[in-house]
Amino acid sequence: MNVKKTENALSLTLKNFIKSESFGGIFLFLNAVLAMVVANSFLKESYFALWHTPFGFQIGDFFIGFSLHNWIDDVLMALFFLMIGLEIKRELLFGELSSFKKASFPVIAAIGGMIAPGLIYFFLNADTPSQHGFGIPMATDIAFALGVIMLLGKRVPTALKVFLITLAVADDLGAIVVIALFYTTNLKFAWLLGALGVVLILAVLNRLNVRSLVPYLLLGVLLWFCVHQSGIHATIAAVILAFMIPVKIPKDSKNVELLELGKRYAETSSGALLTKEQQEILHSIEEKASALQSPLERLEHFLAPISGYFIMPLFAFANAGVSVDSSINLEVDKVLLGVILGLCLGKPLGIFLITFISEKLKITARPKGISWWHILGAGLLAGIGFTMSMFISNLAFTSEHKDAMEVAKIAILLGSLISGIIGALYLFALDKRAALKK
């Protein structure tokens, strides 16, 4: 299959995803830079105090709410993970993860890209209070990685973009498993049973193919609360909810009705302004088209811009700000070195070595249209951990280990920046080299 055929095989949904995530990556970067500037300016005290401001409502002596930081990390990030869960479900059912042949190479790459960074970090920080941060360099920020690829444009094969997206989706799934297994404390089984009950109700709704999103979202709020109270991070509830959202398209006459409405619109007279009849027809077309979409597609379409242009940039602005002064101890255990080496060295080596060995052992096969040099380049870009790595660092280090958290954030920013620059320069040079050979 040549590059032209691969280009044609890339679905419209995937193209839109690349575009939105790429622009989202640039916006994320600007918010991270702004956070660092503000955190090291005369506004730093106001900046840090802002995130500890309680937000909610008071009933007598009882306060219902969280600090702004918790609203972002626990509530808004749950919406982000809901979108991630929807993307994973779609890819598992219809996309690049829908068959073993398609999924094996990027999934194996994702596994290698998580194990190697985690081992590097753990080896450097074993038997220290910071060893629990091994999950930090395991993550990949798809928005940033695709932002870099967008800047490279046609210098990057489309097949490599597909591979990187699929790898990142598998990486997100791995990150969810890591959070559930290693960053869960003080389990409360009564709340877990409550969560299980909600999941069973959601499963029944899915089985009955209830297409309205309202009952799913209302039960999702209840599920979030039960999981939050159980000791498991609440974002896991969002992923579970995503897998319960129906994906079936209704089998009815709405597509025929759409064609008839289209013919009616074409037959109406056109002028400078739409007539009342044309407006009514267009409104009907919009309603029928929306009804043809599955609940999963509707929810994903709704969440994508909110996540890309509001939730993740806000998360970056709230979490990337680190005050770099003489009081910060960069030598806390080996956190700085562990995170940077994990992202910059562990990611590309893990992805390259495990896929190379797997192909030699005939476990999987490299996608057509990309070379091993391209795989190494994708591995470098996968070292951009940023938002996902920061999210895990917030779970790994408590307030008692604040120094390690601050150092981890600096390391994430440095490691992600180094990986992005080296990855971009490497792929640019690779394209130049290929052009000279022609």
UniProtKB/Swiss-Prot annotation:
Question: Has UniProt tagged this entry with the keyword Cell inner membrane?
Answer: yes
Annotated family: Belongs to the NhaA Na(+)/H(+) (TC 2.A.33) antiporter family.
- Sequence intervals crossing the membrane: 23-43, 62-82, 104-124, 133-153, 162-182, 185-205, 221-241, 302-322, 337-357, 372-392, 410-430
Please give the biological process terms from Gene Ontology that the record holds.
regulation of pH
The protein in question is named Na(+)/H(+) antiporter NhaA
- Described function: Na(+)/H(+) antiporter that extrudes sodium in exchange for external protons.
Q: In terms of domain of life, where is this protein from?
A: Bacteria
Instruction: Tell me one GO molecular function of this protein.
Output: sodium:proton antiporter activity
Which gene is this protein's source? nhaA
